[in-house]
Swiss-Prot record:
Keywords associated with the record: Amino-acid biosynthesis, Aromatic amino acid biosynthesis, Lyase, Magnesium, Metal-binding, Plasmid, Tryptophan biosynthesis
EC annotation from Swiss-Prot or TrEMBL: 4.1.3.27
Top-level taxon of the source organism: Archaea
Name used for this protein in its record: Anthranilate synthase component 1 3
Substrates-to-products reaction catalysed: chorismate + L-glutamine = anthranilate + pyruvate + L-glutamate + H(+)
Recorded family membership: Belongs to the anthranilate synthase component I family.
Cofactor note text: Binds 1 Mg(2+) ion per subunit.
Gene source species: Haloarcula marismortui (strain ATCC 43049 / DSM 3752 / JCM 8966 / VKM B-1809) (Halobacterium marismortui)
Residues that hold L-tryptophan according to the record: P269, Y270, S271
Pathway where this protein functions: Amino-acid biosynthesis; L-tryptophan biosynthesis; L-tryptophan from chorismate: step 1/5
GO BP, sorted A to Z: L-tryptophan biosynthetic process
Major enzyme class: lyase
Misc: Component I catalyzes the formation of anthranilate using ammonia rather than glutamine, whereas component II provides glutamine amidotransferase activity.
Length: 503
């Protein structure tokens, strides 16, 4: 089962390389069968270098990926100054990278045989819109990506043993023969590490009583935020605003162990583990912000939530309630309209289409209303331009987007950071896939941070909106409990008083 098999022959590699410009990357592919891709990642990773693991369970990409030890890091700091032309430093960093990196894939079918993998903060929005600086900044970067020239990929969903495609993408400068041999060496080394490496994670378990999540505000203060937004709705400033609060707890268990538990507790279409300098992300995101494949664009907005039922019958009743709720239907329609308009900014005229409308997707703790919107990218529009058009997602800001982001900054105490930004990947042959970073633990400064939010409209009930945020947090907190080896009581504390609901 652990035999390494090369599927790229030298002749086809050389033929592809000779037809490409100098500096182009050309993949060399090896294959190996493993019992579990995440175990392979745990064996290949190293405590002293960056790594990523992206897993889909029915998302649009249909593939999972992992990589270790990037050849380049791309980071934009929290205090980045605007570009000379007034543009976004973060998106210009992406543009610059994609301008100098090119892939000629030959017969390789892996969508991302190499690329830039990482995350963008919600605060990239400050580079795109004039948002007041009223929330507290904790210094987290605006953007962190690693350039990985050798990755492991596999098709999702999978059951039982999995064939992993290890793709190494050396640059071809002068000698295609030498590049081919470099590629074989790179692919072989990653495959061998994935099979035979040692698992380096050493969690230091902490008593669950010392790992209780605490809300920055609690139910009463969150209700005040909801009432403040409802006043803005009455005044005509906004139709809908997504408001969140931050939960924190000591980092009692390693992010790798936490993500392993997340995979079992709440598998999600755009799950991710990122281990980057100073910041680790553990994500169980269900939502796609943007998928680009050549000139084809996709976005998949989520708006409308119910908790899962305790029985199949109760689950069906909750779905009927969700689909018939006029508030949820109206909110979903409004946000689909917003996403259509955003995608239309960079799409060919008449190409934007709602391919699926208000389907119901189920997860371990909640169910959602979901739609799928497609478009065709206009000529001479870059992938970074497409990201700018839709970022941040309308479902986690509100409408109208610019004014709503000002309101968010006014009512939320702390900056969102990675929350409601994006995790994903940029390929080197006109493709990208980015989620919306929700249901995500941020491991920073020896603690876990988990932001959860809810969309507020004119008839929102503050207590119900707070409970919805706890429903959304439940799966991640349960995963932390499982990684701790505890049966979670799911209790939350505010700064001043204990609250039922979350641990």
């Amino acid at each position: 089962m652990t035999e390494i098999r090369f599927s790229t022959d030298k002749e086809s590699f050389i033929e592809t390389a000779r037809a490409a410009a100098d500096g182009t990357r050309v993949p060399v592919e090896a294959r190996v069968t493993v019992a579990d891709p995440f175990e392979a990642y745990r064996r290949a990773r190293d405590e002293n270098t960056d790594g990523f693991y992206l897993e889909t369970t029915g998302g649009q990409s249909g593939w999972g990926y992992f990589g270790i030890e990037p050849i380049e890091r791309v980071e934009v700091s929290a205090g980045a100054t605007p570009a000379q032309d007034g543009g976004s430093p973060s998106l210009e960093a992406i543009d610059d990278l994609l301008d100098r990196e090119h892939l000629e894939r030959g017969d390789c079918t892996v969508p991302y045989p190499c690329g830039a993998f990482g995350w963008l903060s919600y605060d990239v929005a400050r580079e795109l819109e004039d948002i007041p600086e009223t929330t507290v900044s904790d210094g987290l970067p605006r953007l962190q990506f690693g350039v990985f020239d050798c990755i492991a990929a596999w098709e999702e969903p999978h059951d039982g043993n999995v064939e992993i495609h290890v793709t190494a993408c050396p640059t071809v400068d002068g000698s295609p023969e030498s590049a081919f041999e470099r590629g074989r060496t790179m692919a072989r080394e990653l495959a061998q590490d994935a099979i035979h490496g040692e698992k380096h994670v050493q969690s230091q378990p902490t008593a669950a009583s010392q790992a209780t999540f605490e809300s920055e505000c609690g139910e009463a203060a969150f209700a005040d935020r909801v009432r403040q937004i409802k006043q803005y709705v009455r005044d005509g400033d906004t139709f809908q605003t997504n408001v969140s609060h931050r939960l924190t707890a000591p980092a009692a268990v390693h992010p790798v162990d936490t993500f392993d538990a997340v995979r079992r507790v709440n598998p999600a279409p755009y799950s991710a583990l990122l281990e980057f300098p100073g910041v680790d992300l553990v994500s169980a995101s269900p939502e796609l912000l943007l998928d680009v494949d050549g000139d084809q664009l996709l976005t998949e907005p989520i708006a409308g939530t119910r908790p899962r039922g305790a029985t199949p019958s109760e689950d069906e009743d909750l779905e009927v309630d969700l689909c018939s709720d006029e508030k949820e239907r109206a909110e979903h329609a409004m946000l689909v309209d917003l996403e259509r308009n955003d995608l239309g900014k960079v799409s060919e005229y008449g190409s934007v289409d709602v391919a699926e409308y208000r389907r119901v997707d189920r997860y371990s703790e909640v169910m959602h209303l979901v739609s799928l919107i497609e478009g065709e990218l206009r000529d001479a529009v870059s992938i970074a331009d497409a990201v700018a058009a839709v970022f941040p997602g309308g479902t986690i800001t509100g409408a109208p987007k610019p004014r709503t982001m000002e309101i968010i900054d006014e009512v939320e105490r702390t900056r969102r950071g990675p929350y409601t930004g994006s995790i994903g990947m940029f390929g080197f042959d006109d493709r990208a896939t980015l989620n919306i970073t929700i249901r995500t633990l941020v491991h920073y400064d020896d603690e876990y941070r988990l932001r959860v939010g809810s969309g507020i409209v004119h008839d929102s009930v503050p207590e119900a909106e707070y409970r919805e945020t706890l429903d959304k947090a439940r799966a991640l907190v349960t995963a932390v409990d499982e990684a701790l080896g505890e049966q979670g009581s799911f209790a939350v504390e505010s700064e001043t008083e204990p609250m039922e609901g979350m641990r």
